[in-house]
Regions:
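Internal intein/HINT superfamily modules and their associated LAGLIDADG
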Residues: 1-273
């Protein structure tokens, strides 16, 4: 885990404009460890990665999708007795849980996919897998989601698909695709990734009720935040590009997106019959 921390810090310092030798000196002073400037260069250039020597995480589009989905609907759990470190997803849609479980298995080097299980208490499909390295990475990302950028920016479409499967929706009446979250850091990260594939959006704030009522028990809970952020994608070209590059794994959301595109086509036919 220490090497991952060095990797994150090295990339952060490089983005701040420091040279490789200077980064090596800073890391030596801060972490009391010696790291060759050449190794730092290989990290920055993407030639090497500290996780590639471990079988715990396999980088690729599946990892980007897993992280994107987890940022929206995921949790972490640890079983101290068995030393299991679980990455979990709890969702309403089976097709989302199924795809996330397949990708999590691929990330972990597992041949068989993780299978979603229905939990009556949650009224959700739950899928989980034990992966200590991914658990550690996501735990640190709670404090600073930007440390995930090196894993996501090579596969921005898959990362966004995971996040939109978790938090996204289609608003046909307003001709928009939207994603909602209370954490401005996650919304900004999503915006960065969308722009990498040429999809542009705007961010709006709105207030929500302080209390949340559980539909099953009727109990009321205090929300963590009274402000929710909406990232909105609109405009025909943006919507079409989103549909082509990103889309949804969830069938009901993909159907809504298809209907929105058809509305655009009908509107265009009325203007140019």
């Amino acid at each position: 885990m220490e090497r991952l921390r060095l990797y994150d810090e090295a990339l952060r310092l490089r983005r701040g404009g420091l040279g490789y030798k200077r980064i090596s000196k800073v890391l030596r002073v801060k972490y009391d460890t010696s790291l060759n400037p050449g190794a730092i260069c290989n990290w920055v250039k993407g030639r090497h990665h500290p996780l590639r020597r471990c079988n715990g995480i396999i980088e690729g589009p599946e990892l980007a999708y897993v992280i994107g989905g987890w940022l929206g609907d995921g949790t972490l759990a640890r079983e101290r007795n068995s030393h299991k470190y679980y990455v979990k997803l709890s969702v309403k849609d089976y097709d989302f849980a199924e795809e996330w479980g397949r990708c999590l298995a691929k990330v972990s080097g597992r041949l068989e996919p993780y299978v979603p299980r229905w939990e009556d208490a949650l009224e959700r499909w739950v899928v989980k897998g034990s992966n200590m390295l991914l658990y550690s990475l996501l735990r640190r990302a709670r404090e600073n989601p930007q440390i995930l950028l090196p894993y996501l920016e090579r596969y921005p479409a898959e990362a966004c698909r995971g996040f939109f499967d978790a938090e996204g929706s289609v608003w046909r009446e307003r001709y928009q695709v939207r994603v909602h979250n209370t954490d401005p850091r996650l919304i900004e990260l999503c915006k960065q990734l969308l722009e990498k594939i040429g999809v542009y959006c705007s961010i709006h704030k709105r207030r929500q009720s302080k209390l949340l009522k559980c539909p099953k028990t009727g109990k009321r809970y205090h929300r963590n935040s009274e402000v929710i952020l909406d990232l909105a994608i609109y405009g025909r070209e943006n919507i079409l590009r989103f549909a082509e590059k990103v889309g949804f794994t969830i069938a009901r959301k993909q159907s809504e997106l298809t209907q929105l595109i058809r509305r655009y086509e009908r509107k265009l036919n009325l203007i140019f019959p």
